Swiss-Prot record:
GO function terms (MF aspect): ADP binding; ATP binding; metal ion binding; phosphoglycerate kinase activity
Protein known as: Phosphoglycerate kinase
Highest taxon of the lineage: Eukaryota
Cofactor: Mg(2+)
One BP annotation, GO: gluconeogenesis
Positions of ADP binding: 212, 236, 341
Chain positions recorded as CDP binding sites: 212, 217, 236, 336, 341
Compartments in which it is found: Cytoplasm; Mitochondrion
Subunit structure: Monomer.
HAMAP family xrefs: Phosphoglyc_kinase
Length: 416
């Protein structure tokens, strides 16, 4: 799966066509009020570009929340239609389902350039292909899924996916369109361009920074990156498992991942074989409880962490070593913060690392922040626009970094 060879919306002829755009309008709601319109704003460039090309109609589709394959008004996209209309300064026709006669008639009788927003795709079990009933997974009927996909396909002449956050899901609206031209929107295209830059053709030295609690959860990620990077910073909770196994450091009550511990020697062996430098913390900010009001102190790895205390951030010496490693790199991928940044006493390691990667990005290097917690960090400290690329998809970016194919990307047409 080459990330850089996929058709984009700019390669399509959309004039006079019905254009289906799978967007990610999974916005946070407080009742019917949208608390952050960021995801709607992010989709505007693709929508506005298509509008300028005078399409017959634009059909927008998204999921919202987890309605579990049934209609639940709490997860209706109706409030999104109003917000989108305000942002586009143009009426948006909200349809009360995503398939069916009313939807088909509305789209086929569209006024030129009309913008439709379909109701939540996940109100139908056929979108995800299953639902949970009493804790058990119940699969959708195969014929019903095929029909649902045919109904969605019948609303369009061309298909555009601009929802990177769900590109790792083989859902009907992501892989179910029987149309000849299937392209990436600007948002998805930017994601692919940056991940291709790092994973297919990085400017070296290439550094990956990993945080997170468990080695076992990140095993595929580490294993795949060891074939690609020149250096690897390991921070966060999983650093303690590495320190314990490799150096027999006293880690007190810090996170220890017994399953992950068995995998550490193999990973280190692979790093040596591939000439990858692994950088681990050498000192820690520790707390006597997992809380913002914990008592804190700084200890070195030689001193060890006493019983009853846990490591919740890296210490000043580690911050210097991490910053020096960042300063050497030309391509950086960061997935997972090095400390519990949500608590002020344990946020300094994350802040220092963020300063270092921002400086690197500003100096013209490529810095990619994977979605999830690390993207939250970039937003919290207001540096999103100072970093080459902050990914919009936690799960999808993780799977790309693990070396997996994303169904939604594989499904797109290749450039001729």
């Amino acid at each position: 799966m080459s990330l850089s060879s996929k058709l984009t919306v700019k390669d399509l002829d959309v004039t006079g066509k019905r254009v289906f755009i799978r967007v990610d309008f999974n916005v946070p709601l407080d009742g019917k009020k949208i608390t952050s319109n960021q995801r709607i704003v992010a989709a505007l460039p693709t929508i506005q570009y298509v509008l300028e090309k005078k399409p017959k109609a634009i059909v927008l589709a998204s999921h919202l929340g987890r309605p579990n394959g049934e209609v639940n008004d709490k997860y209706s996209l109706a409030p999104v239609a109003d917000e989108l209309s305000r942002l586009l300064q143009k009426p948006v026709t909200f349809l009360h389902d995503c398939v069916g006669e009313e939807v088909t008639n509305a789209v086929n009788n569209a006024k030129d350039g009309e913008v439709f927003l379909l109701e939540n795709l996940r109100f139908h079990i056929e979108e995800e292909g299953s639902r949970k009933v009493d804790g058990n997974k119940v699969k959708a009927d195969k014929a019903a899924v095929t029909k649902f996909r045919e109904q969605l396909s019948s609303l369009a002449d061309v298909y555009v996916n601009d929802a990177f956050g769900t590109a790792h899901r083989a859902h009907s609206s992501i892989v179910g369109f029987d149309l000849p031209n299937r392209a990436a929107g600007f948002l998805l295209s930017k994601e692919l361009q940056y991940f291709a830059k790092a994973l297919e053709n990085p400017t070296r030295p290439f550094l990956a920074i990993l945080g997170g609690a468990k080695v076992a959860d990140k095993i595929q990620l580490i294993d795949n990156l060891l074939d690609k990077v020149d250096s690897l910073i390991i921070g966060g909770g999983m650093a303690f498992t590495f320190k314990k196994v490799l150096e027999n450091t006293e880690i007190g009550d810090s996170i220890y991942d017994a399953a992950g511990a068995e995998l550490v020697p193999k990973l280190v062996e692979k790093a040596k074989k591939n000439n990858v430098k692994i950088v681990l913390p050498t000192d820690f900010v520790i707390g006597d409880k997992f809380s913002a009001d914990a008592n804190t102190k700084v200890v070195t790895d030689k001193e060890g962490i006493p019983s009853g205390w846990q490591g919740l951030d890296n210490g000043p010496e580690s911050r210097k070593a991490f910053a020096a490693t960042v300063a050497e790199a030309k391509t950086i991928v960061w997935n997972g913060p090095p400390g519990v940044f949500e608590f002020a006493p344990f946020a300094k390691g994350t802040e220092a690392l963020l300063d270092a990667v921002v400086a690197s990005s500003q100096a013209g290097n490529t810095v990619i922040i994977g979605g999830g917690d690390t993207a939250t960090v970039a937003k919290k400290y207001g540096v999103v626009d100072k970093i080459s690329h902050v990914s919009t998809g936690g799960g999808a970016s993780l799977e790309l970094l693990e070396g997996k194919e994303l169904p939604g990307v594989t499904f797109l047409s290749n450039k001729q």
